[in-house]
UniProtKB/Swiss-Prot annotation:
Subunit structure: Part of the 30S ribosomal subunit. Contacts proteins S4 and S8.
GO biological process: translation
Protein name: Small ribosomal subunit protein uS5
UniProt keyword annotations, A-Z: Ribonucleoprotein, Ribosomal protein, RNA-binding, rRNA-binding
Keyword Ribonucleoprotein among UniProt keywords: yes
GO molecular function, one term: rRNA binding
Gene source species: Sodalis glossinidius (strain morsitans)
Any one cellular-component term (Gene Ontology): small ribosomal subunit
S5 DRBM domain boundaries: 11-74
Family: Belongs to the universal ribosomal protein uS5 family.
Protein function: With S4 and S12 plays an important role in translational accuracy. Located at the back of the 30S subunit body where it stabilizes the conformation of the head with respect to the body.
Extent of the signal sequence: none
Written domain comment of the UniProt record: The N-terminal domain interacts with the head of the 30S subunit; the C-terminal domain interacts with the body and contacts protein S4. The interaction surface between S4 and S5 is involved in control of translational fidelity.
Length: 166
């Protein structure tokens, strides 16, 4: 299901799903393929891409290009999350919380692929509602994007990090 390879720029690329879709026209059906991929550097940068083409390799290539263009930074805390977070996209809801060292990535399917390439090593995660891979990936990236480090919170409130952490 999840395909991984290393690129020259040390980006991890994972293929999450390939689908055959069809368009019905007067003369019959026209088939094409869609590919969903995630790309990350394993150190807090992650992006996803969705490509569509008449052939599978072309769809995967388009998805990888889009994923590399749409990368974002995630504030990680030594291989885990900063705090429990929720993410939503259409019918998919995801919940993720930090885990202690040695726990591993406890997450299903598409969410696991996103967390692996982002550089998260210990996390407890659960997907609720729709488990459509596209929606789960978008919800996971939404949640990771909403995560705030203590430094970010302190800067926003105009306080020191020690005051924030208590």
């Amino acid at each position: 299901m999840a395909h991984i390879e290393k690129q020259a720029g040390e980006l991890q690329e994972k293929l999450i799903a390939v689908n055959r879709v069809s368009k019905t026209v007067k003369g019959g059906r026209i088939f094409s393929f869609t590919a969903l991929t995630v790309v990350g550097d394993g150190n807090g940068r992650v992006g996803f891409g969705y490509g569509k083409a008449r052939e599978v390799p072309a769809a995967i290539q388009k998805a990888m290009e889009k994923a590399r263009r749409n990368m974002m930074n995630v504030a990680l805390n030594s291989g885990t999350l900063q705090h429990p977070i929720k993410g939503v996209h259409t019918g998919s809801r995801v919940f993720m919380q930090p885990a202690s060292e040695g726990t591993g990535i406890i997450a299903g399917g598409a969410m696991r692929a996103v967390l692996e390439v982002a550089g998260v090593h210990n996390v407890l995660a659960k997907a609720y509602g729709s488990t459509n891979p596209i929606n789960v990936v978008r919800a996971t990236i939404d949640a990771l994007g909403n995560m705030k480090s203590p430094e970010m919170v302190a800067a926003k409130r105009g306080k020191s990090v020690e005051e924030i952490l208590g």
